[in-house]
Regions:
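Hydrophobic/aromatic-rich transmembrane helices and adjacent perimembrane loops
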Residues: 240-266
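Transmembrane catalytic cores of multi-pass membrane glycosyltransferases
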Residues: 1, 95, 99-221, 233-248
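Loop-to-helix entry region of an early transmembrane alpha helix in multi-pass inner-membrane enzymes
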Residues: 3-4, 11-29
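Membrane-embedded helix bundles of polyisoprenyl
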Residues: 24, 28-37, 44-85, 93-122
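Short periplasmic/luminal acceptor-recognition loop of GT-C membrane glycosyltransferases, typified by
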Residues: 293, 303-359
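Membrane-interfacial loop-to-transmembrane alpha-helix junctions, especially the N-terminal start
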Residues: 43-46, 90-93, 136, 212-226, ...
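Hydrophobic alpha-helical transmembrane segments in integral membrane proteins
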Residues: 239, 282-305
Length: 359
């Protein structure tokens, strides 16, 4: 699925517009799935607006399109599991369950594993019974068998690295580390201020309705958010060739927590605050993106035009960007291969992350 979105962007805009259109499609799907979940659980609409800010996380900035698409697939899985009644598993229901599991697997194997975990945990919470859980799990056996055959064949492609854990407790749970895992795309005070505002929003809602108890919470979404938080807290930061193994779950956890928690009570003015805050944040982010492109990518078209056909290219990236965290230009030299063909000294496409393998 991570290849499908830029592929759809390639059709109308060509290779140089494929990335932008693909990310736009991913953003629409991510936010649309979030609002669908919010509406299905009958939560306040303003909660989905607040939760939408977590689209702009390091997952987006690092280009983990498959993981973004997996969020959409998992919400479909969540809703199917929620609406499928316990009892006799008909062929139609079994096919639907298999199709939803296959969609999870084809987007990202981590989401497939998480989906299986949610099937068990939520099934036990709902007291579906062992037989019903086994019936549903049996629908996923062909997918699990495919994963067992496929994964060993590609695990050693490209680069591998040792499993990495944070060296200290503070390395994961300090305020700075939490802010980087929750958003982590842009340098400066913009993202920490936004995260603080979201946490304040959650806190106000909880405080205002503290006497209502569990009635104002969505218990299933709170359980889901807890599983996301657990994945962020206990998983390694890096495993094999999977970067941000733990951190990628925190934006999902916070977005789900915002929907699960009670929204603050107040007049229309208070409900206007999240929309205004999201608009200002998106405007600031857009200006920073534009500034980065104008200052860091000036002349790239001329450079590509000056190269011969099918060159051999060595890509080097040593300078930290003053706007973005991470390394947004790590693969900029890959545009040479898109425009002129040839060979690169390194490409993330060299190792398989899905059923598509680059040779």
């Amino acid at each position: 699925m991570g290849y499908l979105l830029p592929g759809l962007g390639w059709l109308p805009g060509g290779p140089f517009a494929a990335g932008r259109i693909g990310f736009l499609l991913a953003a629409w799907l991510w936010v649309g799935a979030l609002h669908t979940l919010n509406a299905n659980r009958q939560r306040p609409a303003v909660s989905a607006t607040v939760a939408s800010v977590f689209l702009f996380s390091h997952v987006l900035y690092w280009g983990f399109l498959s993981f973004l698409a997996g969020w959409v697939a998992f919400i479909a899985w969540f809703l199917l599991h929620d609406r499928m009644p316990a009892g006799r598993l008909t062929w139609r229901r079994a096919i639907l369950f298999f199709a939803a599991g296959a969609l999870l697997y084809l987007t990202h194997v981590l989401w497939f594993l998480f989906g299986v975990g949610w099937l068990v945990v939520d099934g036990l919470r709902r007291r579906l019974g062992v037989r019903e859980l086994l019936r549903r799990a049996l629908c996923l056996v062909p997918i699990g068998a495919l994963a067992a055959v496929w994964f060993p064949s590609i695990v050693h492609r490209g680069f591998t690295s040792a499993t990495h854990w944070p060296p200290t407790f503070a390395a994961r749970f300090s305020p700075a580390s939490i802010a980087d895992a929750a958003l982590g795309g842009i340098r400066g005070p913009l993202e920490p201020a936004l995260l603080l505002g979201v946490l304040l929003w959650i806190g106000i809602g909880i405080w205002q309705q503290r006497r209502a108890g569990r009635a104002v919470w969505d218990g299933r979404l709170l359980l889901l958010a807890t599983l996301y938080f657990a994945a962020w807290a206990i998983l390694p930061s890096k495993a094999n060739n999977t970067l941000y193994f733990a951190e990628r779950w925190l934006p999902c956890a916070l977005a789900t927590l915002v929907i699960a928690a009670p929204a603050p009570r107040g007049g229309s003015g208070l409900r206007f605050v999240p929309a205004l805050g999201l608009t200002l944040f998106m405007a600031g982010t857009t200006l920073l993106w534009h500034a980065a492109e104008r200052t860091s990518l000036t002349g790239i078209d001329e450079v590509l035009a000056s190269l011969r056909e099918r060159p051999r290219v060595l890509g080097l990236s040593f300078v930290q960007n003053r706007i973005f965290k991470g390394d947004p230009y790590l693969q900029t030299f890959a545009w040479v291969q898109v425009a002129r063909g040839g060979e690169l000294n390194f490409s993330f496409a060299d190792f398989a992350v899905a059923l598509v393998v680059y040779r």
